[in-house]
Amino acid sequence: MINGAFRRRSMAWLAAAALGLGGLGLGDTGTVLGATTPPATLADAWLDLERRQPGAIEWQHAFALRDTTAESVPSLRRRLMGDLHTLAVSARVAGNAPRQRSLEAWRAHLGEWQDRHIRTPQRLDLPWLAANLRHNPPLERIVHFGVCEAPNWVEVWSLDGVTRLDWVPDMSLEHLRDSLSASAARQSDTAAIITPLGEVHRRGIAAWNHQPTSLAPGSRVLLELPSRQGLRGALPFPGVGDEEDLINRRLPELLATRVPGERCRVWGNDEGHNDEGHNDEGHEVKE
């Protein structure tokens, strides 16, 4: 979980960024977003935005979308929806109606997503780029970048469906697990945690592999499908257990591509042009 120390350190990183980027000929972009001298890299664009925006930027809720991610995410989502359909049909044939309903709820939730509300699941904020200048991408390879307001929820994908819990200070996996139905909590041994930074961490949640873990606001948590238990042999379709393993791997990867909040300001790589035209304030997206 990221706290105030991150924000304090970011100010030092910003100063380092200005020096480091300037040393590489990248720090002076003249005028900013929408100006006649466009930023050449993502770090340049962040510096422009940082100078323009009132108040501090919450870098732990900043994001960017590479063109390669924008091309791959729609097909990943379609494949995952197909896998969920296979499992839901198998659960129905096996007479497992609760499991069928849960998987159909997951699939329906994915079907409601808009592919433009995505990010590349890695840190591309200014503090990180300042410390990793060799990984500073050219702006022409960035579809958009932006910052979200810190949300007040944690999203949970479990056999109860897809739910959002109000985030509270010191919220942990234990708190989250206690909020689930007994059957949903009992059937999962492992959870995949997707942080607001787009990182995926796996933690044990059963008695035998329990790992204490705190949750940041805006985290998404998948209680993984129980592929190691008796279900694989009970399902009527050969190879269905493979779909479970794929979902346990692919769904966290897909969740990591979601923007880290609901109220976000997004800027395109055309220096402030967006769907509504030229606007240094960017445009707002909502899930």
Model-derived segments and spans:
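Ser/Thr/Pro/Gly-biased, low-complexity, turn-/loop-rich segments
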Residues: 2-7, 27-275, 280-287
